[in-house]
Amino acid sequence: MIEEQPGVNWQDLQLRVATILRECGLLPEVSRSLRLARGTVEIDVYATDPTTTPPAVYLCECKRWRSRVPQAEVQAFRTRISDAGAHFGFFISANGFQSGAFEVVEHTNVHLLDWQEFQNLFLERWCRTYWIPSLRTCGDRLAGYVDPAGSDAAIREAHGEPLKPAEAVGL
């Protein structure tokens, strides 16, 4: 799991989604307005993936409702994904979806995800692009405090034990 909780409100959920996408190498924008054929719409998280050719576009809808998201909301999002020409649509809900919602997105590029499913979808990429490099950076910072080649000799010397001739000259 990347993040424990989806946040306390919908704005927090949007920011957490954008953070995960950014850590995966995407370029997210929170609350972006898009002009479509039917008018201007507000997209919770708009992201492009510069690692693909051409860059893929992801549109995310984030709901932190107490109830399950109804089918009509999912239908409206699916239409926005189609009108925008996005490659992927992720509808992320903290409390799931009503049963008919899944039929609306069948055979489309729209994915209905709870918070855990969204994280699982990006977990491998997040580990590869963010977590492992972060661990390497931490390890590199600690490397100056560790001398694996001479540590055994340094311990013996600190305890007053005699050093072998090669150790005495640092070989």
Question: Which residues are covered by each model-predicted region?
Answer:
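Mixed-charge (Asp/Glu-Lys/Arg
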Residues: 1-171
